[in-house]
Amino acid sequence: ELGLPGEKSGFVPTRAWKQEHFGKPWLKGETLLAAIGQGYVLATPLQLAVMTARCVNGGYAVMPKLTRNAIDEGGETANAADFPKIDISARSRQILMHALDEAMNHPRGTAYNSRIMDPGLAAGGKTGTAQVRRITMLERESGVKKNKERPWRERDHSLFVGYAPVDQPRYAVSVVVEHGGGGSKTAAPIARDVLKEVQRVYAPGKLAKREADR
């Protein structure tokens, strides 16, 4: 929690929740939908960034702050190891980080065209495309219009979550472009520019010099 008005909680549905609210049992297909963030799943851009950070930082439940540094109760600068661990195995983290790396740096990855090619600055991440309207079976049979052929309000949202650098993560980012279309076309290039610039400006050597000059 940032302590700002308007914050919203995320939501991951359960079998009990669906039964209580709709009086219907959970379907196997809904598990697959939830796994890719569809169906009843809700998340804000900030929550997506926090999720990414927690998965790649060693499994520590870091919390975002609107300050230059996160300060603990003793007045010391907090780091990831100061936070509790989340319930994710080392094996699961390894698989996830490899997948995020491949999605951005493998030629067949969905974000390959937005990869960072500067030595030592490579990022990992995943594109996302959020459907904003229901597509009927009749539309599917007759042919669904391409995103750019639809009215703006019916176009998909463009998403991307990522982190950098891939070998020693320090930064996490999420980008959501409303009605921006596919994640690889709109959100991923923005995230690439952000991750590249933050690594350039806050390179470890530059950070050490700034702290020494303070």
Question: Where are the language model's segments positioned?
Answer:
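Short amphipathic alpha-helical face segments that pack within enzyme cores
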Residues: T44-V50, T186-D193
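Extracytoplasmic/secreted cell-surface and envelope-processing proteins
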Residues: Y60, G182-T186
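Short, gly/Ser/Thr-rich active-site loops of penicillin-recognizing serine hydrolases
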Residues: G75-P84, P189-R214
